[in-house]
Amino acid sequence: MILRCIAISSLILFATCGTDQPSPKNRPKDVWVIRSVLDRQPRMLTIALDTNCYVAYDVAHCTLQKVWKGGIILQGAAYTNQPNLQPVSWGSLYSDTLLNKWKIGREGEADDFHVINKGYQFRNDRLYLKFAIVTSLNDTVKIEESPEYVTGDDGRPGLERKFKTSNVPPGVKVSLTNGKSNFVLNSNGTSEFTTLFNPITHPRESPKESSDHTGRNYMEKSDCYTCHEVDRQNVGPSFQQIAVRYKSDETIIGKLVSKVQNGGTGEWGTSVMTGHPQLAEGEIRTMLDYIFTLKTDKKEEDIENNQSEDLPPAANTSPGDGAPLKGLHPSFDLTTIRKDNFRPRVGGLAFMPDGRMVISTWDSTGGVYLIDNVETGDTNKITVKRFAAGLAEPLGLEVVNGEIYVLQKHELTKLIDHNGDDVADEYASICSSYGATADFHEFAFGLVYKEGYFYATMSMAMRLMSNEKQLPDRGAVLKIGMDGRYEKLIYGLRQPNGINHGPDNSIFITDNQGQWLPASKLIHVKQGEYHGMQWGRIDTLSEPPPMAMPAIWMPENEATNSPSQPVLVPDGPYKGQMLHGDVTAGGIQRDFIEKINGEYQGCLFRFTQGLETGVNRLCFGKDGALYIGGLGLVGGWSYNGKQWGLQKMKYNGTPTFEMLAIRAKSYGFEIEMTEAISRNIKIDPDKITIQQWWYLPTASYGGPKMNLEKLSIKKIDISTDRKLLQLHIDGLRKEHVIYFRLPKWSSETNRPLWTTESWYTLNHIPGRN
């Protein structure tokens, strides 16, 4: 971004007192205080004081960064479905000589110090930023700063800055400087000054498209860079691979246009390309014209890729049998608990002690909402109130002792309602020191509270330059204390969009397939473990450490695609098992886990589809219902092309015939059914498909199944109640995935088998070390 600097003759007016009197203002935006990346700098706070004045603070260093006339463009994945972009400012600077550097003096000498962001608070329509300066002697000086737009007697625009200091030790002076001028704050008191600027009559307009090819502009404004990169395969092929494989003739271009608009699979492996019906044919042709300019002299096979050779057969499949489910699980009733005009992209979901639901939203509002009467399921009785706004991509939420904590992209924040009006007055920073850059993919997911600590997951950056490195905190689970201190528990993760409590008060996460992750995972968090993503390995190691095995491998597009938050089932027929959602494939999967040789392992079952959008967050309410928060990104991370959803599933008592559990045994496996298998059915071992393989992590997106083989069942024993099957299988290998596919059996009550497949991760075989 380029801002025009205005040469000024500033008038600085000093005063030594300040007030908190009401100061009604006509703010230019409904949400006028906004956390985000800004102009490629993380941890920024933009304040829209007036149409004539925006200010931005670097909250990482607690300093005023810029004052300008213009505005802010909220662009990017959460705002405009453009993953490769981030918010930028536009307009013209009032000054480039701001007093924006802190100084500490002790007995006339400069003192070492560091500054800590403590958040901000709204009082009487003014914003008060809170900082703490820790001196070399560990004194903690508290500072409040309140900026406001004013005009001088001559009509010139100005910025008023009010300060309040406390806990300043004797002999210590706190001041602001720009290298030439200083302003000393009154110790343990109030201070203020106003800077007047020359008016800006014609601020620089919003930035125009910067790319030199219209096709690239269209791609940046769409979601193309979510799944594709220029020279390396990601979810889909690289643009260079496309340019090398296809000729730029009318027949081929017509087919590619159709593929982009309608979606499909099979050309580049198992990954499904989502359709883009919103794109016009002319726009797609312009994009393709740009892609063909990327053609190289390399052969297609020399471009980094990971095309799968084990495509699933399309024949002899039906919903739940070799293919995804289509409808709602028969044992549950589904209710949509939002009105049509409320469209939340749910980033976090929890409940208050009084039963009200709390959600955070991954959108341009960055909101937190209190939703009442959700247990009724009646949208005429359900009420929604915005509790907070302006948060930066809040993808985690937790309620602790009735207090709301939210995990933003760059900060763990406590939201405080001081006056009881159900609107947050204070956004208190608990932790904002973990590593972060401006990369769009550095998501922070969460949030779980356990025994005095919060647990959150950090996503890897995906658009670093060749001379840049991943920050040490990325691709990790962090344990964060109430005092803001944190430690890294496990590392080597990629995009761990899900964390929650599991059996025995343990913590489980999900991670998404990609580079060095041949399939998605359900992982039991054990301190110190490395989980395979080599971008996050310790630089001092010449070789990566051994990769810890997940509790469950989740085969891409067979079982899941973009797994999200897991949740432990508290009651009912699936008590003690876990469920997890899927943002891209949609629906919910069920996870049965058991402990073998002291470690968790288990299997995945398809559970339900029939929901309004991809599933991002899950939480059980006091009424026993499963509450479902949906989220989608146009084109890339979405199910059915929809971006929002809020529903609940309530158990209705209707039995469903399905596999309840698969347990590893010394002889093979035990399969437990929810109902008796019909006595009219002959259990034929040759009709049950058993396969095994292991996954090879590679630098490419995903990874191949290695040593894929079909296994034979030597013998089947069935219990007298026809609910338990004991499968005696030779040739099983540890650290392999075992695939099961049953025939389309029916139960003794003539119910059809809901789903025939399961995938078991056999890390250990009982009875073997």
Label every model-predicted segment.
Residues 221-231, 273, 287, 291, ...:
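The canonical Cys-X-X-Cys-His
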Residues 19-144, 158:
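Beta-strand-rich N-terminal accessory domains
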Residues 299-662, 679:
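Beta-propeller domains with acidic blade repeats across secreted/periplasmic ectodomains
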Residues 676-715, 740-748, 756-759:
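Short, surface-exposed alpha-helix to beta-strand junction/turn motifs within ectodomains of secreted
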Residues 226, 232-246, 259-288:
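Axial heme c-ligation environment in periplasmic c-type cytochrome domains
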Residues 275-303, 731:
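C-terminal capping alpha-helices of c-type cytochrome domains
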Residues 210-230, 244:
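Sequence/structural segment immediately N-terminal to covalent heme-attachment motifs in c-type
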Residues 124-128, 132-160, 652-679:
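Surface beta-strand/loop "capping" patches
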